[in-house]
């Protein structure tokens, strides 16, 4: 919109954070990774390298001192609800990020962190960081992801379990976790144009993210089991988290607004571009205008109809290809 009122508020707060951690050199990284993503967005919007520096600092700090959160808890007479400072896997703080290989802990926290890492590696060219992202990507998609693109199989900590522990009836597979997986996949596409990243992004979108919301947008799943057992799901202590029908709302209502922001920014995931090429990652009916000047019209009823037609309205002065993938990821 070009309006800066909200951005000015964000930068004012970011200046305070920058002063505390960079200027005054205080130790620490955020407990729930997400400010890194906001800082990267602010950097892309403003070009201010301070926000890139701060995001990089938080990513580099995580896991350097695995006991940091324990020290912080000892300074206070209270702790955030449900936050065990000794649970290093839960908060991805057991190792420095470049040494991590297995996706562990709270699934949403994990993929938000990995998204920030992938965004930073794409911007900085940090090969060691991207190598870590690739290892973590393989850990998720080869061994710790449901066929629906759901991740985080255990209710205990809303977390990743061990390899291949993917029970269908007690699955957690939080909607926000699959949204975060889409964030991660999209960030990986900024590093390398590999079809697998788009495949997983599409799988998560059609099978878990959209499934997490009723068609009329009035009811939502927080948890997305692959199997519901009548009389047990939502009732038994072992299955109480797996509800058989979508509730209207939640006390912890992170998923509905997360779905809303993803859908309203869908074009950023369906399409991409660089200096001389435009990309189609997913298929959606509509008009597309790229920053490089190219304009397309896509006509499709995908995924109900496998036909996808593109019309080039404006080619611009650049040599542009559209990269398409085989359609096979929608259930």
Locate each region found by the language model:
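Glycan-recognition and catalytic cores of secretory/periplasmic carbohydrate-active enzymes
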Residues: 1-331
């Amino acid at each position: 919109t070009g309006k800066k009122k909200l951005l000015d508020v964000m930068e004012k707060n970011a200046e305070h954070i920058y002063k505390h951690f960079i200027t005054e050199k205080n130790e620490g990284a955020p407990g729930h990774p997400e400010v890194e993503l906001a800082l990267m967005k602010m950097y892309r919007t403003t070009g201010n390298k301070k926000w890139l520096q701060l995001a990089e600092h938080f990513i580099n700090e995580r896991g350097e001192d695995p006991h940091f959160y324990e020290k912080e808890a000892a300074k206070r007479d209270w702790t955030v609800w449900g936050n065990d400072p000794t649970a290093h896997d839960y908060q991805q703080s057991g190792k420095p990020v470049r040494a991590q290989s297995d996706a562990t802990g709270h699934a949403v926290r994990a993929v938000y962190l990995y998204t920030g890492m992938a965004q930073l590696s794409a911007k900085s060219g940090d090969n060691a960081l991207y190598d870590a992202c690739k290892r973590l990507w393989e850990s998720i998609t080869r061994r710790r992801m449901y066929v629906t693109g759901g991740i985080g199989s255990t209710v205990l900590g809303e977390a990743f379990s061990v390899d291949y522990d993917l029970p269908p009836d007690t699955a957690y597979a939080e909607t926000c976790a699959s949204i975060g997986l889409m964030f991660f996949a999209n960030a990986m596409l900024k590093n390398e144009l590999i079809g697998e990243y788009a495949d997983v992004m599409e799988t998560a979108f059609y099978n878990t993210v959209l499934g997490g919301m009723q068609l009329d947008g009035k009811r939502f799943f927080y948890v997305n089991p692959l199997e519901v057992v009548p009389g047990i799901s939502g009732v038994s202590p072992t299955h109480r988290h797996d509800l058989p029908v979508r509730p209207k709302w939640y006390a912890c209502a992170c998923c509905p607004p997360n779905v809303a922001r993803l859908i309203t920014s869908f074009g950023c995931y369906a399409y991409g571009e660089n200096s001389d090429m435009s990309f189609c990652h997913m298929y959606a009916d509509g008009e597309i205008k790229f920053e490089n000047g190219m304009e397309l019209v896509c006509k499709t009823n995908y995924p109900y109809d496998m036909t996808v037609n593109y019309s080039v309205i404006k080619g611009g002065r650049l040599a542009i290809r559209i990269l398409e993938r085989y359609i096979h990821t929608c259930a």
